[in-house]
Regions:
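HotDog/MaoC-like acyl-thioester-processing domains
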Residues: 3, 84-93, 100-164
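Residue-level signal for pocket-adjacent positions within structured domains
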Residues: 9-15, 70-71, 137-139
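Residues that recognize and position ribonucleotide moieties
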Residues: 7, 18, 73-75, 122, ...
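Short aromatic/hydrophobic contact patches that present stacked aromatics
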Residues: 8, 81, 130
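Short loop/turn motifs enriched for small/polar and acidic residues
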Residues: 12, 78, 113-115
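Acidic-residue sensor for enzyme active/binding pockets
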Residues: 30-31, 79, 111, 156
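Hydrophobic beta-strand-centered segment that forms part of the acyl-chain substrate-binding groove
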Residues: 36-109, 124-126
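Catalytic strand-loop segment that frames the active site of acyl-thioester-processing enzymes
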Residues: 1-43
């Protein structure tokens, strides 16, 4: 994992058995993705498509609510998976890691891990998220901008060649 983000386990995160509810893990992964993207200068790079994309202008879809002055491009989560290794409880001190492991033509695959903040061998969960770079007005996938691909390559320390 490249970017680590500390998580504060809250009382509201717990189920009746005082474990972190299984659905909360996805929220922890989401917070880690946000922390990861905060390391990218000028995120979300929304203006790049004006010169890079050949997509034609399509009608706005009511499924995605944006304002006229809002961002037109960004990620939508297509898939999230989580494997639970150990239960999390209120007193655990943990951090969530994120790494980009694949960049496709329109998709970005990230892996996540929740671990003990001091004992890094104590892994609570591992997960994966598939995000799609979309035009928010149309709800349709568009190519990942080259500047975003380059930012991922810089953070991760290796290339993500454009698939042909």
């Amino acid at each position: 994992m490249k970017i680590w983000f500390p998580i504060q386990i809250r009382f509201r995160d717990l189920d009746p058995l005082s474990h972190v509810n299984n659905t909360v893990y996805a929220t922890y992964y989401e917070e880690a993705r946000s922390a990861y993207f905060a390391h990218i200068p000028h995120w979300p790079l929304a203006g790049e498509h004006a010169t890079e994309s050949s997509e034609k202008e399509e009608e706005h879809t009511a499924r995605i609510q944006t304002t006229v002055v809002g961002r037109h491009y960004g990620i939508l989560i297509k898939e999230i998976t989580c494997t639970y290794h150990l239960p999390l409880i209120r007193t655990d001190r943990v951090e969530v890691g994120s790494a980009v492991v694949h960049v496709g033509r329109t998709s970005i695959v990230m892996e996540h891990q929740i671990r003990d903040i001091q004992n890094h061998e104590r892994i609570f969960s591992t997960g994966r998220a598939v995000a799609v770079w979309c035009n928010y007005r149309t709800g349709r996938p568009v190519p990942v901008p080259s500047a975003l691909r380059a930012a991922f390559e810089e953070i991760e320390g290796h290339a993500f060649p454009l698939e042909t």
